[in-house]
Amino acid sequence: MHNIFKGLITALITPFKDNKLDLYALERIVKHQIKHEVDAVLIAGSTGESSSLSFEEYKLLLQTSVEIVNKCIPIISGCSSNNTTYARALAAESTKIGVDGFMASPPSYVKPTQHGIYKHFEALHEACNLPIMLYSAPTRSGVDFSDETILRLSKLPRILALKDCGVDLERPLRIRATVKKDFNILTGNDEVVLAFNAQGGVGWTSVASNIVPNICKELLEKWNKNDTKGALEIHQKLLPLYTALFVESNPIPIKYAAHYLGLCENEIRPPLTEASDSAKKQIENIITSLSIKI
């Protein structure tokens, strides 16, 4: 099975207007990614406010994204839930709609054991025939995969990758030493992309690339061509942007940044709230200093 989980994957925001999906803005957002040749887009992940979506909204979001992309790049859907039955339904619907793969985290809040995490993903694996990326987000889930559980899950034929949002930079080396060769490991933290890939990662699921996909793509291309100096120069330039985009809970800052650049409304669903005035100012200043334009 072809492994689509590599390179630059943008964790897309979900645009809203008047508390409904803004499909016109979604088209702008997705086409901006296609224009700059990202390797894939992730729909309805944490950055996409997936927990705020109804099942009908989830289906509409995926269906519209598939139509817009029209097979130009792979689409990855988020299928995280603390209810295994509901997560299976998301995976089955993703398959029916025609996405290219999906991502899921361990069930949040309920704090399953490692055996429970394994059984959850085994159930998702059985629910569809799509490639799957594990999503390690311990600060959001409250639990994480152990190295042993990752190894067990990697033996299931369609579990092909791990997106790691943790801070253990030795983990890619440890995992790489045990899993099958075609199992990919990507970082979900913009600020550690180079350090992570130096330790065995093969890509990056990025928040910042919602607004600077061209720069993020250039950074990764330089890294992959062994132009370490060039990659570091770009990374250093982007560090203040990474900081600004996480000055408050994701996706609050990136939603405002996208709004400021004309991609969408600055509408975010409760219990999240709009960026504070100080956060807005910080975001505006870095966008101006980097001359970011859409």
Swiss-Prot record:
The reaction(s) annotated as catalysed by this protein in its Swiss-Prot or TrEMBL entry are: L-aspartate 4-semialdehyde + pyruvate = (2S,4S)-4-hydroxy-2,3,4,5-tetrahydrodipicolinate + H2O + H(+)
| Coiled-coil boundaries | none
GO CC term, one of those recorded: cytoplasm
Q: Where is this site: Part of a proton relay during catalysis?
A: S46, Y109
Primary enzyme class? lyase
User: What is a single molecular function from GO for this protein?
Assistant: (R,S)-4-hydroxy-2-oxoglutarate aldolase activity
Q: Which pathway does it serve?
A: Amino-acid biosynthesis; L-lysine biosynthesis via DAP pathway; (S)-tetrahydrodipicolinate from L-aspartate: step 3/4
What compartments host this protein?
Answer: Cytoplasm
Listed A to Z, the keywords are:
Amino-acid biosynthesis, Cytoplasm, Diaminopimelate biosynthesis, Lyase, Lysine biosynthesis, Schiff base
> What is one Pfam family matched by this protein?
DHDPS
Please give the SUPFAM superfamilies that the UniProt record associates with this protein: Aldolase
Task: Tell me the domain of life.
Answer: Bacteria
Whom does it interact with, and what assembly results? Answer: Homotetramer; dimer of dimers.
The name under which this protein is listed is 4-hydroxy-tetrahydrodipicolinate synthase
List the source organism.
Rickettsia conorii (strain ATCC VR-613 / Malish 7)
